[in-house]
C-alpha cells in the first residue's frame, strides 16, 4: 500500500478512535489481558499490558493501528513472553465466517488481484493480463453471506444454551467488521478448559466424529428400538428431525437405515455433520493464547467496526457497522463489482476517478480496489 493511502487510512482511523471511543468495549479484568496491534504495512506488536480505558485510548491515539487485538485469556503477567505469562483461564470464543460456508454467491463477489501487474479481474485463477498465478483474492460480501452466517450463529447459540447449559445472558455476538461473527461466552463452565477439552467441545458443536453405535446402529444385530426418537434432546433429536423428517416416517426410515447397513449409516452421520453441524472455525476456539480483534475497533480489511449485535435478526451489517465520515473523497477506483454501504450503492468502477464518501473510499482502499487520487 502506498504512503498516500496509508496516511488517508490512518487519518480516518484516528478520527474514529478520537470521536467514537465509547464504542470500544474495554474488557473486564483489563489488566490481566494481553493486548496487541498492527500498523499499516507493518508486523504485529504483542505482549502489551493495559491497565484501563485511559491507557487503551492513549495507545490507540499514539499508534493509530490498522488493527487492535485483545486476548480471551487472563494472565498473571500479560506483558511477559508467552511461557512466562502464567495462564489462568480464558473466555470461550467462536468464529463464524462466510468464507467457510461454501456459499454459491461467493464467486459472484470475489475479485482476483494480480500481485505482479495489479490487474483486477472477477474471481479467476490466472491473471487475464500477464498470466501470473500469483493472485490475491478479495471478497465484497453480500447480504446472503451475512444472513447465512446468522443462521450458523443461531445454531451455535441453541447448542450452547440447550445442550451445554450456558446462560443466554453470558453469550455476546459481535459482527467481525468484515464477513462474519465472533461469539463470546463468559462465566461458563469452560473458562478453565485447555485446548484439548475445547477441541472436544468443537467436535460436539460441529457434530464431528459421531459413531453409528451412539445413534443405534451396530455392525451385528442392530435393534430398531435403539435408534433416536423425534423428541430426544441434543444431537439425537436433531438427527431424528433431519433424517426422519417427521414422527410418522420414523419407522419407515429406520427400516431403510437397517437395510442399508453400517457403512451407509456412517455416511448418513457425515451428511448430518455437513448439513446441520455448526460451521465454526475450530482453530479459533481451541487456541487459548490467541489475541482477538478488540470489540469496537476497526477491521482494516474493510474499514468497518467490530460491533456488538444487540438484535441479530434486525442487525444490518453494512449499515450498523459503518461509522466513518460522509465527507467526500476523490479516489481512482477499480472495483468491477457493485457494493452497498449505509444503504447507498457504489460501483462498478473501471479505473476511473470518482468522488465518494470517506466510508466508501476507506472500504475500497482497504480491499486494494482504489487509491487516493
Curated annotation (Swiss-Prot):
Q: Name one GO cellular component term.
A: DNA-directed RNA polymerase complex
Cite the active-site annotation.
95, 97, 281
Per the record, the GO terms for biological process are: DNA replication, synthesis of primer
Q: What is an example of a Pfam family matching this protein?
A: DNA_primase_S
Which InterPro entries does this chain map to? DNA_primase_S (IPR002755), DNA_primase_ssu_PriS (IPR023639)
Cofactor(s) listed: Mg(2+); Mn(2+)
Keyword Glycosyltransferase, does the record have it? Answer: no
Q: Which UniProt keywords apply?
A: DNA replication, DNA-directed RNA polymerase, Magnesium, Manganese, Metal-binding, Nucleotidyltransferase, Primosome, Transcription, Transferase
UniProt superkingdom: Archaea
Q: Which GO terms describe its molecular function?
A: DNA-directed RNA polymerase activity; metal ion binding
Entry EC number(s): 2.7.7.-
The UniProt function text for this chain reads: Catalytic subunit of DNA primase, an RNA polymerase that catalyzes the synthesis of short RNA molecules used as primers for DNA polymerase during DNA replication. The small subunit contains the primase catalytic core and has DNA synthesis activity on its own. Binding to the large subunit stabilizes and modulates the activity, increasing the rate of DNA synthesis while decreasing the length of the DNA fragments, and conferring RNA synthesis capability. The DNA polymerase activity may enable DNA primase to also catalyze primer extension after primer synthesis. May also play a role in DNA repair.
Which family, according to the similarity comment?
Answer: Belongs to the eukaryotic-type primase small subunit family.
Q: Subunit structure of this entry? A: Heterodimer of a small subunit (PriS) and a large subunit (PriL).
Name recorded for this polypeptide: DNA primase small subunit PriS
Higher taxonomy: Archaea, Nitrososphaerota, Nitrososphaeria, Nitrosopumilales, Nitrosopumilaceae
The gene that this protein is the product of is: priS
